[in-house]
Amino acid sequence: MKKIILVFLLLLCLLAAGCAAQPEPIAPELPSDEEETCGPGGPYEMTCRIVTGAKSGTLLLAEHGDALSGVYTLDTQSLSKGILPEEPLQDGQLINVYYGAFTEAWPMNFGGVSSIELVDGGMDDRCALYLRVLEDLWEKDSGLNDGLEVIGVDLSQTSLAPSERSAVAWAFAESHEANLVEGSLEELTEQGYITATPISSTGSGVDLNEPKYYFYSWENGCHFSIIEQPMEDTYSLTPVTFDAQKWRSSLGAYFFSNCTAVQSALGEWSDYTIGSEMIS
């Protein structure tokens, strides 16, 4: 009898190990509104903004909503024509994605996509605008990019939704093969990314025991930020003004000041103008 029990327990352990070795895509919890789903097996629906990739067919998507932070990828090249809308996709569009599951990664990946539909009036390509700004900053004072392994991005002072901020930051860091951290200079200093070295205000070195001044630097990283400024609407167009900064140290930074871009009635943002540029 004991041998039978031991064999039975051994079989249970082998069965559990076999199940654990087969990871499956994670399906989201069903929403409370049953009309939004097609039964317990999906498809599920999610509204996303196309951040980038419409031309290449590899979409980077930001979950739509002021309090949502999901970032997803979707390869439309592998989808049949009946799944895609007839109108070509564009960066900045809102789309509804009907899917069966998503894989746990970052960004997450949609699986079992059965349909993609455009959302009327959802065009807003501000993400693409700010990606251009970050890339333009990257090209300025290229010496600040030397030895760079980490890119810090702070878009918290823009009107982008949390998911859009994360998607833009990820796309920028990924394009330069760098690790990404999000946060302000103050936050990254507190987290230990940025070093604060005390300096003497008198030159004697006496006040280094209780320093009032510090030299800040990031040995293997560079920080990029965009801050929007208030501006009134102009006629039928919607403008935005902003400042942008690239920072490596207290004496190594580049600035775009008083930049302006205008959104058309169709939701597309123009190229931006720079009021002035500064270097330190």
Annotate each predicted stretch with a short phrase.
Residues A20-E29, D33-E36, V51-G53, T58, ...:
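Flexible low-complexity loop/turn motifs enriched in small/helix-breaking residues
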Residues T103-W106:
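Short, solvent-exposed loop/turn segments at the edges of extracellular beta-sandwich modules
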Residues G82-L84:
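Short, solvent-exposed loop/turn positions at domain surfaces
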Residues M1-L10:
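Positively charged n-region of N-terminal signal peptides that target proteins for export
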Residues C38-T47, A253-S257:
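Short coil-to-beta-strand transition motifs
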Residues F256-S280:
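Short beta-strand edge/turn micro-motifs at domain boundaries
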Residues L15-G18:
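C-terminal motif of bacterial Sec signal peptides marking the signal peptidase cleavage site
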